[in-house]
Amino acid sequence: MASKSGDGGTVCALEFAVQMSCQSCVDAVHKTLKGVAGVQNVDVQLENQMVLVQTTLPSQEVQALLESTGRQAVLKGMGSSQLQNLGAAVAILEGCGSIQGVVRFLQLSSELCLIEGTIDGLEPGLHGLHVHQYGDLTRDCNSCGDHFNPDGASHGGPQDTDRHRGDLGNVRAEAGGRATFRIEDKQLKVWDVIGRSLVIDEGEDDLGRGGHPLSKITGNSGKRLACGIIARSAGLFQNPKQICSCDGLTIWEERGRPIAGQGRKDSAQPPAHL
């Protein structure tokens, strides 16, 4: 299963744009992140309104810490702790009812991929998470195809050698319906999944060990609740944008708007905090 935040793991670098105007802003950021378990190093650049955090925490948790200072923060890029850009991607998940989430993929090295994210609106408990073959949402999640499985293997758990490449195991939603997770995977590569889809399921994935007819096919994790196409995203220092060329919104205005649709133009739209 996915690790809980602060439980260790491989350090990555997160690049945030943070609204800062003076030295007291810088001091507030340092004070908030100092001593936080999982935060290894913090570089604050006032002139660039940038905060670079070396951490093992999910990006959403670091963003929440930064915004607890009363300043808006926007994740602009991710990279390895050596500040290398080996590939990054993102999936915006939408589905049944109020379920929505953001999941990011980062190639930490040629052997290791980080998958981290936050999904809201789930029933408390374990939910199977998988990369699927197709980035086709024409019939919602039903047109995403089977699990990504270029090797023709049986379904298994993320620690198994014999498994679908897209088998990411389970993530746990807490009592409030939010799942925040950080997975390190040795089989998945960012460059292999761009253009495919990510799907979260209704129930727990039995990791191929349940004895059900679907155990070795899907993990018997129930219907598909939410999904999104995996798209390339910016690595470290690859996103200098301050104003969106398509509609003139600043990154701070975008922070509280949907990525697309009518709600993007609605100034009263509350932030999703994803």
UniProtKB/Swiss-Prot annotation:
Chain residue ranges for the region called Superoxide dismutase-like: 88-234
Alphabetized GO MF terms: copper ion binding
InterPro entries linked to this entry: HMA_dom, HMA_dom_sf, SOD-like_Cu/Zn_dom_sf, SOD_Cu/Zn_/chaperone, SOD_Cu/Zn_BS, SOD_Cu_Zn_dom
Source species, domain of life: Eukaryota
Residue numbers binding Cu cation 2: 244, 246
Keywords associated with the record: Chaperone, Copper, Cytoplasm, Disulfide bond, Isopeptide bond, Metal-binding, Phosphoprotein, Ubl conjugation, Zinc
Family: In the C-terminal section; belongs to the Cu-Zn superoxide dismutase family.
Purpose of the protein: Delivers copper to copper zinc superoxide dismutase (SOD1).
GO biological process, one term: superoxide metabolic process
Cellular component per GO, a single term: nucleus
Main location: cytoplasm
UniProt note on tissues of expression: Ubiquitous.
Post-translational modification: Ubiquitinion by XIAP/BIRC4 leads to enhancement of its chaperone activity toward its physiologic target, SOD1, rather than proteasomal degradation. XIAP/BIRC4 preferentially ubiquitinates at Lys-241.
Protein name per UniProt: Copper chaperone for superoxide dismutase
Crosslink position(s): Glycyl lysine isopeptide (Lys-Gly) (interchain with G-Cter in ubiquitin): 76, 189, 216, 241
Cofactor note: Binds 2 copper ions per subunit. Binds 1 zinc ion per subunit.
Parts forming coiled coils: none
Keyword Hydrolase among UniProt keywords: no
Subunit structure comment from the entry: Homodimer, and heterodimer with SOD1. Interacts with COMMD1. Interacts with XIAP/BIRC4. Interacts with SLC31A1(via C-terminal domain); this interaction is Cu(1+)-mediated. The heterodimer CCS:SOD1 interacts with SLC31A1; this heterotrimer is Cu(1+)-mediated and its maintenance is regulated through SOD1 activation.
Pfam families assigned to the protein according to its UniProt record, in alphabetical order: HMA (PF00403), Sod_Cu (PF00080)
PANTHER family in alphabetical order: SUPEROXIDE DISMUTASE CU-ZN -RELATED
Domain HMA: 11-74
Location(s) in or outside the cell: Cytoplasm
Gene3D superfamilies reported for this sequence: 3.30.70.100, Superoxide dismutase, copper/zinc binding domain (2.60.40.200)
